[in-house]
Amino acid sequence: SKNMNKEFNMILENVTGINSKSKISKVAAEKEGSKKGKFRLFVPPSHEDFVGLLYNFMGKGKEGNKHMAFFEKALIRPLNRAYRELNTMQQSIARDFKTLNKQFPDVKSKLNKKIEGLEFTYEDAVRVYLWSKHKHKIPGLSTKEINALSSVVKNDQELKAYANTLKTISKQKTYVAPGESWTAGDIRTDLDDATSKIGRAKVFAEFQKNVDVIFSEENLNKIEAAFGKSFKEALKDNLYRTKTGRNRPTGQNALVNRFTNYINGSVGAVMFINMRSAILQQMSIVNFLNFGDNNVFTAAARFADQPQYWSDWAMIFNSDMVKERRGGIKTDVNGAELAASLKGAKNTPRAIVAKLLELGFLPTQIGDNIAIATGGASFYRNRVNTYLKQGLSQKAAEKKAFTDFQAVTESTQQSARPDMVSQQQASSLGKIVLAFQNVTSQFNRIGKKAFLDIKNRRISPGSSSQIQSDVSNVSRITYYLAAQNLIFYSLQTALFAMMFDDEPDDEKILKKTKYMIHSSIDSVLRGSGVFGAVVSVLKNTVVKYNEQREKAYNPDESAVLGELLNIAVPVGIKSRKITNAEKTLNYNKSVIEEMETFDIDNPIWSARTSQIEAVTNVPVNRMYNKVRNVRDALNNDYTTLQRALLALGWSRYNLGIEDTKVKEVKEKIKESKKQEKKKTKKDNKKKSFKKKTFRKRGF
């Protein structure tokens, strides 16, 4: 540890000029740091991930490569190993718990039932029995109550066997101790605590030991003096969240937590059974390609070896890491908190809605897993071959290759891993302003790291020479900061489909092209942090304001306000749903009255379900649109491509398909009004003629 501390101080001296043997007091660090770290706008320290923060300690050229190797060995690899072991532990406990419940079906069925004569359930009794057995203090319970609940378990041999086995599968010396709010939890939360708290501390021991040496208080003072207070705070925040495994700030009151959950629910409603998102996830397959051992040609060669490729694919898909990603919402910060809020939740309406929204993430999770296995299989096998050539044994090569695969996956896919989440994203403000920006933030960081490696003439991890590193980094910058966004939005808006129409609508194509370009710019801006999000909103507000000012007829001022509300993405979503619902009701008033109430195409259903979804987060509008999509996908009047895209989640609006039934009703109403007008005109003529005749006859 002394050598590690000495080496880090030498690195600081090389990068910052601060003498490696000197010490800086807290006050001196604060005074010196107050002048540093300002005007970092593109991915500032508060929006960096852990590795991005480490990049500040890396010098230029060969020295920079040595610095990178130091952090790789001391921090990055131990961290990735710790997460792999944690995933294995969590999956092992989950499997054992599932097996336990199968072995004791009668016990499982009565766990939530109340014990006769007591205000407690059998599940409470099991937990209290184990806590009492291991001499844990149980907050809020009297000795009499503890003895009564323990006796229930002791006098029921099956329940006792269940409880004792439960302690074994928790893989701890004693059953996890209760907290002050233990009544809000259950056996599942106890097992989660066994891994996320106690178990986490064990598997992260090596990483944490190195962190304590490298980022000691003395060294943090030097860091503050060199990089500023905001940098030091961002680093400490990231290290704390990595240690605890929690992204939500601690100490928030119940109302703040409830509001945050409500906002997260808005994100969940958008992602509910989002098939289009699952399909677009497959774009990330190319994230595993590089200019080294998994280039286009070697990846193709691995795919050509079909038996080995599918064996690796299945191994990855069924690995503990990938199972963890689909076992909870581990791909999105807001989604992960939504899932966390369910732990120990009772069957209240709020808990039921949250559970529904969590289940709605499943298609996206499966899409994410398929993309990882499909792109990762060739990467993994090529990396195994690389390590075998370097002299590693088969087992060592496979283990090291999987750790590399895990690192690439977590850094290029969406991830809610605390070290991959910035201080901004983890804050209450970030949950609202940076919602849906998990992956764009990752991409911006990749692009920034690539630029810094080129600028400082460093060889990036995975490259064997400077030229290979430079080519790879130019490719990363081009793809992650430009091409990926353009491709994504052209697919999301179905712009590609419109270009293949027999009679392409140039005006619609131009409109979608503008949207694609603006959205791509917004992705880079929002992915750079809160400041970029503000710039994005102001840009879009000015554009929308000018659009409405240029309209000669019926300008929509609410659209300008709507753009401003997009600073808080979930609030903007709710605002659009309510505004669009009101517009639908106003513009289609006569159509709604003319059509049958229970006609699925009646605009009233689109409007009302949007209003309900906006207010309650219950994804009724998503369900309504899914039903229509399935019906339209079976409609032979549409082209094969249109039907396929409708089935995969693209809307009629995305594909430029008009709602013919509503259009026909509008035409019918228009014709009816025209005929009514003619009739009125004719009647008026008759009345006028009669009046003239009466006057001529002297009446």
Regions found by a protein language model. Name each.
Residues A28, P44-S46, F50, F71, ...:
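Hydrophobic alpha-helical segments
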Residues K21-S25, A29-G33, N87, Q91-N112, ...:
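Flexible coil/linker segments and helix-coil junctions enriched in charged and small residues
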Residues S1-A205, T260-G265:
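Noncatalytic N-terminal accessory/assembly modules of large enzymes
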Residues S1, R77, R84, R95-K98, ...:
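Basic, mixed-charge low-complexity alpha-helical segments
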Residues L191, T195-I198, F204-I521, Q548-P555, ...:
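Hydrophobic, often aromatic-rich secondary-structure segments at membrane interfaces
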Residues V15-T16, M58, A226, I316-V322, ...:
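Short, aromatic- and cysteine-enriched interfacial helices/patches
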Residues V433, T440-G447, S475-L495, I517-T541, ...:
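Membrane-active amphipathic alpha-helices enriched in small hydrophobic residues
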Residues E507-S519, K544-P570, K574, A581-E582, ...:
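Membrane-proximal bilayer-interacting regions
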